[in-house]
Regions:
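N-terminal chloroplast transit peptides
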Residues: 1-39
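Compositionally biased, intrinsically disordered/low-complexity regions enriched for serine, proline
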Residues: 13, 20-22, 60, 66, ...
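Intrinsic disorder/low-complexity segments enriched in polar/charged and small flexible residues
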Residues: 22, 26-28, 62, 389, ...
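Long, composition-driven mixed-charge/polar low-complexity segments
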Residues: 31-45, 75-82
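Single-pass hydrophobic alpha-helical transmembrane segments typical
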Residues: 41-73
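Cyclophilin-like peptidyl-prolyl cis-trans isomerases
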Residues: 68-460
Length: 460
């Protein structure tokens, strides 16, 4: 069975790159170097062209690359299909990009995916998140201006408007005060970095402090925005899927992976780790059925002791159990979709589009004639989680999923062509760097739901 996208562009867009998830942008990590180089070279058309041409030559020049895999794993794209077409999706509302900059911050994307309508908090989010980008690129003046803008917003009537739409105004008021208080040490750290010699330890230390203050403030921003989700809010789901598990809000899953070879360790930018620990946020607002299915399987222990079945530099994939079945067979199949050829519990393809009140089901954006529209959660962050399915059947997904290894340098802003074809149901928010060395044969020791299990709704 194959699982494909339909464009050469996507194949050219997803080379392995470390996520920008380190506690400090100045640690000796190639992940940081990658992020900074991406920023500095974002307008280097020639380098992008060369990289694209090199990948094209690889695909066209290696017939073996086009062979179908000799296994049952559902794949997120087939190279034989990719080289036949060159279809580019031109996003109208770029959820995955602003201007020419691709938003590859998983936590930012999750905030943008919340069902809230406060223009004031989105303005606050834009200013606060901009500080992180400016600090990482040593744009010290703009970073300082961003901190002043955050304080200005929080000192204005906009703060009252934000508190007014919270479920608990007191919680939001206190949270906004904490964010505001963090701007003082952030500004002080930026000023210290401006006074230090470029490249000095003093500059690095000051930028570390500024970066860490922004990270703390951003986590508080998440708390603030989550308070703005209306009480009891649930994404509408058609009644025909009521016999499938559903996730009504968000859940957090922690996963522990070890090397398949005894004694082997994960090599992350020259540092060895005996195990890989990742934290993922699963989104039930945009993917109630897909997210519910995944959280249900995690809670059942389905992924415990399961090997990684694919790692090719584009994706890391798992979820295919032993035996003839290519998905989960332990539960009752839903009536609307039915079961797979080997008794697999199947779920419908589920896509949430910007501006819609509920997801579309059993189809894709292209099949709906809405090609180019933006999805709420895009495949634009390293470690974005996608639901695998058969190439030509949108409703053949069961238990296989993948983490996307995303490289924004080769993906034009707003043109990630997985969006709208496959559900993006969550992101890795901690430990995404480990994905660069998770290989086929490595083993998921355990996967556990650590938060949000109460939001998993089982069929009656």
């Amino acid at each position: 069975m194959k699982f494909t996208s339909n464009t050469l562009l996507f194949a050219l867009s997803v080379a392995p790159v470390a996520a920008f998830t380190n506690p400090s942008p100045w640690s000796a990590s190639s992940a940081t170097t990658t992020a900074l180089n991406a920023e500095r070279s974002s307008n280097n058309v020639f380098s992008t062209f060369c990289a694209t041409a090199a990948m094209s030559a690889l695909l066209w020049g290696s017939p073996g690359m086009l062979a179908e895999p000799a296994n049952n794993h559902q794949l997120p794209f087939g190279l034989n299909e990719i080289v036949q077409q060159n279809v580019v999706a031109s996003a109208k509302d770029k959820a995955s990009a602003t201007g020419s900059r691709v938003n590859k911050d998983a936590e930012s994307l999750l905030r943008l995916g919340l069902p809230i309508e406060s223009k004031e908090v989105r303005e606050l989010q834009s200013s606060l998140e901009g500080i992180k980008q400016d600090v990482a690129s040593k744009r010290k003046g703009p970073a300082a201006d961003g901190a002043k803008k955050v304080k200005s917003i929080l000192a204005s009537k906009k703060a009252d408007k934000m508190a007014a739409v919270c479920r608990d105004a007191k919680v939001c008021t206190a949270t906004m005060k904490e964010i505001n208080d963090l701007m003082d040490p952030l500004e002080k750290a930026i000023k210290a970095s401006q006074d230090a010699f470029t490249g000095s330890l003093e500059e690095r230390d000051a930028l570390d402090k500024a970066y860490n203050a922004q990270v703390k403030a951003a986590k508080l921003l998440t708390t603030l925005e989550e308070q703005m989700v209306p009480k009891g809010y649930k994404t509408p789901v058609p009644s025909q899927y009521s016999d499938l598990p559903q996730l009504e809000q968000r859940a957090t899953v922690e996963m522990l992976i070890k090397k398949g070879e005894a004694g082997a360790q994960f090599d992350i930018n020259g540092v060895n780790f005996p195990e890989a620990r990742m934290t993922m946020v699963i989104d039930g607002y945009t993917s109630p059925v897909t997210g519910g299915n995944f959280v249900d399987l995690v809670n059942k222990g389905f992924y415990d002791n399961m090997p990684i079945q694919r790692s090719d530099g584009f994706v890391v994939q798992t979820g295919d159990p032993d035996g003839e079945a290519v998905g989960y067979t332990g539960g009752k199949a839903g009536k609307a979709i039915g079961e797979g050829p080997k008794g697999e519990r199947l779920i419908p393809c589920e896509i949430s589009i910007v501006g819609d009140k509920m997801p579309i089901y059993e189809t894709t954006i292209e099949d709906e004639g809405r090609g180019g529209e933006a999805t709420i959660l895009p495949f634009s962050a390293y470690g974005a989680m996608g639901w695998a399915r058969d190439e030509y059947d949108p409703n053949s997904g069961s238990s296989q999923f993948f983490w996307l290894l995303f490289d924004s340098d080769l993906t034009p802003a707003g043109k990630n062509v997985l969006d709208g074809r496959y559900p993006c149901f969550g992101y890795v928010v901690e430990g995404a760097d480990f994905l660069q060395d998770v290989k086929e044969g490595d083993v998921i020791v355990s996967a556990k739901v650590t938060e949000g299990l109460q939001y998993l709704k089982q069929p009656n």
